[in-house]
Amino acid sequence: MLENTNRTLTAAATRLRLYNTATHNTSEFKTVTPGHVGMYVCGATVQSSPHIGHIRAAIAFDVVRRWLLRLGYNVTFVRNVTDIDDKIIKKASENGQTWWQRAYIYEREFTEAYNTLGVMPPTVEPRATGHINDMVELIQRLIDRGHAYAIKSADGNPTGNVYFSVPSWQDYGALTHQNGNSDNNSDGSNGEEKASKSDKYNPIDPADASPDKHDARDFALWKAPCDFDQKDARWNTPFGAGRPGWHIECSAMSHRYLGDAFDIHGGGLDLRFPHHENEMAQTLAAGWKSANVWMHSAWVTAKGEKMSKSLGNGLSVPSVLAQKSAWVVRYALGGVQYRAMLEWSDQALNEAQSAYDRISNFLERAGRVIENQPDYAEVQGVDADNLPEDFTKAMNDDINVSGALAAIFTAIRSDNALLDDYAQSQNESQNDSIKSLIKTCVLQVRAMLDTLGLDPYSPQWRRNAQKSQDLCEDADNGASAEHKALESLIANQLEQRAIARAAKDFARADAIRDSLTAAGVVIEDCAQGSSWHLS
């Protein structure tokens, strides 16, 4: 789905409701600026290759963005890249690389994975190292306002360590309702109880264990060089040489690109605490406003355990793509509501493959009737007010993708019945009317699919089809090499059957039909001739 700045807000936009982590409830979505959404999503820490857990989060917020666009909003979507941190430096040193070489290599891998799985490029994709000055200015602002302090050596020189003073900010804990010492007291819905303050899912920054802190809850804004740091992994500042803490970059970059106030801040569930809690505190303490809505996508799990690099159970994107097409993998990762845990299994992939087969069979069958698939621009032109009510209702209910998919398959069942009517009708005038209706149905189905990033005829999937030869046919003539070969074989069989019927050799005609049926090919005879589709 493409973005543009000529959108008109739909009536459906007024009914969008989103769950806010900070309030623990679902409420009407209202924007800071009418008709515009500012959205910041925490992106990758590019220490190593992406796994499907990373991509699930990216797909989840890609769908949120696509729905906002379909509702008629203009969207500024910012997704950062963390290209400097402890793990990047350590792993680079272990592998004989500079930290920036490693970051560059894996940033490209993430970008390739996003592109392959149909995630729209962000409006802005800032790197942490490109915004050091913004971070330094923010840290100084916090010091000046009494919410941060720089550590000095015994002789009064800056050490390079700066900490946020948690006791100075009385509203600390507003996001997750914990103060850094207490147990997590979230309501536990949709797996939130698993994102506790300090465990294997939420490792604490080593800099936060420093004895120099004034309070145990204080956290690092700027970090002095460590023993394992490479010499160029530091910047000179008034606080001393060092590099950014874990949390400061997102406050600095979201403010840089979205201003003092914006609409949505997103990220994975494991970022709730401490990352987003600390980010909210330092942003508010700087005198800026926090995001209106905080959204968190749940994890991909394997046997009930979160997939992660640190736990060693993450499935790489290439390994999954070796099993199924990118479209199928995206469906499997994005086919549930974003706050629901997603248990990964072969069954999930097989169900996604079945969904692809049902969708592509319908679109191919309908495409033969209307002769050409609608242009992608036409699909984009279908706004939320012109989609089936059950789809719009599901998407407006906190992006309920499961309900939206149910609406799509309901539409496909109805549309297949319409195609049956067309195949059986011998009334030319009636068929013209049905044909026009079928095109409208195809536009709606493709617009719904495109909202989920799953329109097989979109430019994204057409490019992937040329690359992998395992997706749907392209918009002009139809298909992969395999499908073209299948079409040729079936066309030959239908021609032989037509010759047999003309010669009144009905036994041979029936035998051809039976052999095709046994192979999973459904033949439909009508006044205009015979057509086929896969069962």
Regions found by a protein language model. Name each.
Residues 69, 115, 143-144, 295, ...:
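Alpha-helix C-terminal capping/helix-coil junction sites
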Residues 2-47, 62, 133-368:
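Alpha-helical recognition segments enriched in aromatics with Gly/Pro capping
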Residues 2-5, 306, 313-535:
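Structural preference for alpha-helix termini/caps and helix-kink/transition segments
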Residues 23-26, 32-120, 138, 528-532:
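N-terminal, positively charged nucleic-acid-binding surface of large information/translation enzymes
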Residues 92-99, 123-129, 240, 268:
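The substrate-binding groove and active-site-proximal loops of carbohydrate-active enzymes
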Residues 73, 147, 521:
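Short phosphate-binding/catalytic loops that engage adenosine nucleotides
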Residues 56, 130, 245-249, 399, ...:
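Aromatic- and histidine-enriched alpha-helix N-cap/loop-to-helix transition segments
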